[in-house]
Regions:
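N-terminal maturation segment of proteins
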Residues: 1-303
Length: 303
């Protein structure tokens, strides 16, 4: 389990950074700085690794495990098998989405990347330098989707193009310069000379890698405009319904069918509404009390 954790968490340095504040405490001292690998070779390696994980799990005697261990076993087995089952539908994945796609989320992650040590700063700068290559892989992936008739709609594509163009406006005063400088100023243990050096390096990485990455992505997507064959959403692709069911299982951990889950939600909603109606019928003043109630952030977090 520890080996699986280390392998998976170090596949993407951003995930590692936001998951573990001090990797050394977990024995993770030597890891490659990477944004991940989207190549077909990497995908094949990932599938082989999943098969090895499942093989490793099968070596355990399930009945001899504790209840907690059985729960861990079940979760891992389901997670690994689910990914393998849908591996052939990888082109249904969408890396570029208006609010949650890579192009939208990566700048936020860079902005919020905390600097707790000199190594954090150096890892961050290395990630910036890798961004254009990573975006090139995204472009290749989107072209492959287009060739397969699975490219996004023109509306979604134009939205992302506009985002990319907006991101590089006023690059001399970009927020990734300002936020970097603020974090560097707060980091103790660096000399003024080191801080000045890192500031210059950050601006250089933005000019040479980040801004060109977004320019190239916008240009590539512009070339792909008109490649989309479906304006109606995921379920309208040939195997879109099946992929949606996979996403539901992957994101919720539920093994029930879509129809069963819909019924469960509907029944629970009816139950809650009925309970609310009964309470307010017996105590009409609850309506007024509810409208007057206010919650502090602490209250809402614990409610």
């Amino acid at each position: 389990i520890n080996d699986i954790f280390e392998t998976e968490v170090t596949e993407n340095t951003i995930n590692l950074h936001f998951t573990i504040s001090d990797p050394e405490k977990y024995g993770i001292t030597d890891y490659p700085v990477t944004l991940g690998d989207l190549s077909n070779d990497a995908m094949s390696d990932s599938n082989a690794r999943l098969e090895n994980y499942l093989s490793g799990l099968s070596s355990f005697s399930y009945t001899e495990l504790t209840l907690n261990q059985q729960l861990t076993y079940d979760i891992l087995e389901n997670y690994f098998q689910l990914q393998l089952d849908m591996a052939d539908m990888y082109l249904y994945d969408e890396l570029l989405r208006p609010s949650t796609g890579v192009q939208a989320q990566l700048p936020i992650l860079y902005e919020e990347y905390s600097f707790n040590s000199k190594k954090d700063v150096e890892d961050y700068l290395k990630l910036l330098a890798l961004t254009d290559e990573y975006f090139d892989q995204i472009i290749s992936f989107e072209k492959e989707k287009a060739d397969a008739g699975l490219f996004m709609s023109d509306f979604a594509c134009q939205n992302i193009i506009d985002q990319c163009n907006a991101f590089i406006v006023d690059s001399d005063n970009h927020y990734l310069i300002e936020t970097f400088n603020t974090r560097i100023d707060k980091l103790t243990g660096l000399t003024q000379s080191e801080k000045d050096h890192y500031r210059l390096q950050n601006e250089k990485m933005l000019r040479e890698h980040i801004f060109p990455a977004y320019e190239n992505l916008a240009a590539a997507l512009t070339d792909l405009l008109g490649s989309g064959t479906n304006e109606n959403g995921l379920c309208y692709f040939p195997e879109g319904k099946q992929y949606y069911e996979y996403l539901l299982a992957y994101n919720t951990g539920a093994s029930e069918s879509v129809k069963t889950l819909e019924n469960m939600i509907s029944n629970e909603r009816v139950k809650v509404l009925q309970e609310s109606s009964d309470l307010t019928t017996e105590n009409p003043e609850l309506w007024e009390l509810a409208s007057e109630a206010t919650l502090t952030p602490t209250d809402s977090a614990t409610t």
